[in-house]
Every structure is written in structure tokens, then in C-alpha cells.
Amino acid sequence: MLQLYFFPMACSLASRIALMEAGIEARYHLVDIWTKKVLEDDSDFWTVSAKGAVPVLVLENGERLTESAAVLQYIADLKPELGLAPRPGERDRYRLQEWLSFVGSEIHKAFLFPTFWYRDDAAKAAARERIGKSISIAAEHLAGRPYLVGERFTVADGYLTWSLLLLGRGGVDIAQWPSLVNYVAHMQERPQLKAAVEIEMRLRKTVKV
């Protein structure tokens, strides 16, 4: 069975969404990302990943996979018939990688990471100044289309949905981008995605921030 190390409502939520959308059972290990402890047994998370970051996906052979873009594509490829990622070699596979990279670098690392991790107000303000342009790119792309890539839900949609849900907590109101408001509402109509978010929202209340 796959195992996922996660922190509630962190970027690892996208991996939970992918697993649930794929119908793949997994064992979930909650990590305190501040103390670097695995909460179920108080073990040292650094022994799981030298990066000290979630997600970490433990494969059935014991190998460990990190970084959201890699983890999400791995999960999608376990159930290729579901189309959670275009098949390797298809042109849209590169579009998927394009959007995974964009969300990871331009929204996640450029804004969400400094907003929730940095203590320096100047750094947070600088991140907030830049985020509007990045969000506008996603909003323009999604105007008149239901998904980031092609005509169906992919793991990139799960990753973007997570980031958009957190923007409000970071002081950015997506109401100024109607296409994104519609997109998030559309995504939350998906039973498995909605259930994944609800699970992590409940768990978030049990951990210190």
C-alpha cells in the first residue's frame, strides 16, 4: 500500500486529492511541519525525507518520492485509464507539466510559501505584489474552459485548486477573477476532491499552526 506523509492543507493536499480521485487506497501519516515530527509515533520526519517537506509518497517497494509535480504524475500514471494525466508522449502531457511547474513556482513557492512560512513582513509584502500577475495568467487561461489541460480533470487541477483555496488565507481575494471563482466552484462539485478538502480541514483544527 502507498503511504503519504502530509500536513493538513499544505501542498500535500493535492496528492491526497489525486489518490482519492484515482480510487487508490493509501496510508496517511500526519507530519508536524514545524517540529518535523510524525505525530502518530513522534518519530523524526527527517529520517523519512532529508528535505523535511511534504509530500512524501512511499511506494510499495519502499522507495520514497518527493516534490508535488513528481508525486502527482506518479499517482496519475498508476491509473492511466482515468486520464488524471495525459499519457507520456502525448502533447498534452507537456501542457500538464507546464501547469504543474507554473503552480509550483509562480503561486506555491513565490507566494504561498513565503506568506505562510516567512516571518519577515517585507518579504511577505514583496510576494503579495507579484502574485496578481501570476493569478491573472491562470484566470485568463481558464476563462471559458473548465480545466487547465484538455477537456478533463487532471492532477494539475487538484494542485491549482489547493493553491486557490489558500490564497484567501494569504490575503488575496479571488473574487476579482470571476473565472477562478467559477473554476473553484466547479472543482468543489467533484465528490472526491470535496471529500479530500473536508478531511484536511478537519485535521487542520487538530494541529498547531
Regions found by a protein language model. Name each.
Residues 70, 179, 192, 198:
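Residue-level recognition of oxygen-bearing side chains
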Residues 55-58, 148, 194:
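Short beta-strand(s) of the beta-wing in winged-helix/HTH DNA-binding folds
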Residues 198-209:
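Terminal-tail/helix-coil boundary detector
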Residues 32, 113, 180, 200-201:
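Residue-level "edge-of-site" marker
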Residues 18, 76, 163-164, 197:
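Active-site-flanking alpha-helical
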Residues 91, 99-191:
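GST-like fold's C-terminal all-alpha helical module
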Residues 36-38, 184, 204-205:
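Generic structural signal for helix capping and beta-alpha/helix-loop junctions
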Residues 1-126, 139:
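GST-like domain detector, emphasizing the conserved glutathione-binding G-site
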